Amino acid sequence: MKLYSLSVLYKGENKVHLLKSAYDVSSFSFFQRSSVQEFMTFTSQLIVERSDKGSRSSVKEQEYLCHVYVRNDSLAGVVIADNEYPPRVCFTLLEKVLEEFSTQVDRIDWPSGSPATIQYNALDSYLSKYQNPRDADPMSKVQAELDETKIVLHNTMESLLQRGEKLDDLVSKSEVLGTQSKAFYKTARKQNSCCDIM
């Protein structure tokens, strides 16, 4: 599970422009990183341009998913992640980032803003924090703990069944042992009966 890009954009009347972004392109080769970053910016702008205001959607491109949230006030966010990353966590992140951005950056700066002029520096920390959704999102953490508990419970049940099979063997052996003990007792009793002292 990996996040590659987190962007905040403004959807204007005629054009979508980037306000701020953060990228993690460390998994790509050094010579591809700038091209990959440009492509992510282009894709983010294109997806926001084609999305309606007040909508959330996910777009699949090869092994990547682009999650977009365009608010009614024209502020938009895009997360680019791999297929394994939970979409719910992406939309939670987008909602949190856009809410924080809208409180820290004046609305009048959105239409004319650019990455150089917008003073908002939390995207890099959010991108690194949300790399592991279990650590960043409480719901994912609970789900992971439930999955682990289910695995432990399943393993415990399997070991109990194995132990149960061994207990069955012991029970059958004890039944055999009980029969032999009874036979031994009867035989011993018969032999000792001649030696009764009166």
UniProtKB/Swiss-Prot annotation:
InterPro entries xref list: Longin-like_dom_sf, Longin_dom, R-SNARE_YKT6, V_SNARE_CC
Positions of transmembrane segments: none
Record keywords: Coiled coil, Cytoplasm, Cytoplasmic vesicle, ER-Golgi transport, Golgi apparatus, Lipoprotein, Membrane, Methylation, Palmitate, Prenylation, Protein transport, Transferase, Transport
Lipidated sites in chain (S-palmitoyl cysteine): 194
A GO molecular-function annotation: SNAP receptor activity
Residues with a covalently attached lipid (S-farnesyl cysteine): 195
Record SMART domains: Longin
PANTHER family reported for this sequence: SYNAPTOBREVIN HOMOLOG YKT6
Record's protein name: Synaptobrevin homolog YKT6-B
Source species: Xenopus laevis (African clawed frog)
